[in-house]
From Swiss-Prot:
Protein name: Pore and endoplasmic reticulum protein of 33 kDa
Lumenal domain ranges by topology: 46-56, 120-126, 198-199
Gene: PER33
Miscellaneous comment: Present with 2240 molecules/cell in log phase SD medium.
Provenance organism: Saccharomyces cerevisiae (strain ATCC 204508 / S288c) (Baker's yeast)
GO biological process: endoplasmic reticulum tubular network organization; membrane organization; mRNA transport; protein transport
Top-level division of the source organism's lineage: Eukaryota
Pfam families: TMEM33_Pom33 (PF03661)
Membrane topology according to the record: Multi-pass membrane protein
Key words of the record: Endoplasmic reticulum, Membrane, mRNA transport, Nuclear pore complex, Nucleus, Protein transport, Translocation, Transmembrane, Transmembrane helix, Transport
């Protein structure tokens, strides 16, 4: 919305004082800190410890944003924390699905466990939530910024959201599919193999990675069952993978791949949700 020219504006300090009384403001701050730490995560490629710290903080802040949304649902009686109904709620509430997955990964990250790619889709959502809140609730009241610049920023943000929201939502699903395939086809089976081989001397890193991987696969199944568009995109990626294997590898490799893929899918459908 364009910033009005003649309507008197409350001082920015007054606006902030009113905003900090609202849960949505902390939701906004959580999205900002998520984006900031996600950027720091990618800038810290030379330090594994710094990356781990940024990963933990990103998971924490984005979990807080989902917790705030769930709290709002709870206050308005849209969500009841009844353990007998939790399974049904988990199947239909995407906010609950994301919170559960992210919070479990946050807990496991305290033991140096990272699931690469798990942050991409939540961060995409954070970018759009951050921009929309900033445009509607803070930009009109910012001091020392000319009105024409505020209107320009408002217009640019509005156009970006309108033109790219659908595209980036689809990209978020693509990232979840890529992460789900990588974790389900390789990470979980590999760590399960290590678990069997090193039963007497298995490290917590293997167990933790296994738990984190299963958490993401469980989350992915919930998203897969709930979203028709994700099912369609998933089928396209599996078909591309099948075509690549049959086109570039010997026939026996294609048979092995199909057998392995069918085995993984059988296990996938047995995962309880």
């Amino acid at each position: 919305m364009t910033v009005p020219r003649n309507r008197p504006m409350a001082p920015f300090g007054t606006i902030i004082k009113s905003r900090i009384k609202q849960p949505q403001f902390y939701w906004f701050i959580g999205h900002f800190l998520t984006i900031f730490n996600f950027i720091q995560f990618h800038l810290s490629i030379t330090s594994k410890q710094n990356q781990l710290s940024c990963y933990r903080r990103s998971l924490f802040y984005i979990s807080v944003t989902y917790a705030i949304v769930l709290y709002q649902f709870f206050k308005s009686d849209q969500l009841k924390f009844n353990f007998t109904l939790l399974r049904q709620e988990m199947k239909k509430l995407d906010n609950l699905q994301y919170f559960a997955m992210l919070f479990i990964l946050f807990l496991l990250s305290q033991f140096n466990i990272i699931i690469s790619g798990s942050l991409y889709s939540p961060v995409i959502f954070s970018i759009f939530h951050f921009l929309n809140y900033f445009k509607e609730n803070l930009l009109p009241f910012l001091p020392l910024i000319p009105l024409n610049l505020k209107n320009l920023l408002n217009s640019k943000i509005t156009v970006f959201i309108q033109n790219y929201n659908g595209f980036f939502l689809q990209m978020a699903q693509v990232f979840e599919i890529i992460c789900g395939l990588r974790v389900g086809l390789f990470l979980v089976p590999f760590n399960f193999f290590l678990l069997l081989v090193r039963r007497a001397n298995v490290s917590f890193e293997v167990v933790g990675t296994m738990l984190a991987g299963l958490t993401y696969v469980w989350f992915f199944k919930l998203r897969y069952l709930q979203s028709e568009s994700m099912r369609q995109i998933f089928k396209q990626y599996v078909l591309r993978l099948d075509a690549y294997v049959s086109r570039t590898l010997p026939p026996y490799c294609s048979r092995l791949w199909n057998g392995y893929k069918n085995f993984v899918m059988t296990v996938f459908w047995k995962i309880p949700v």
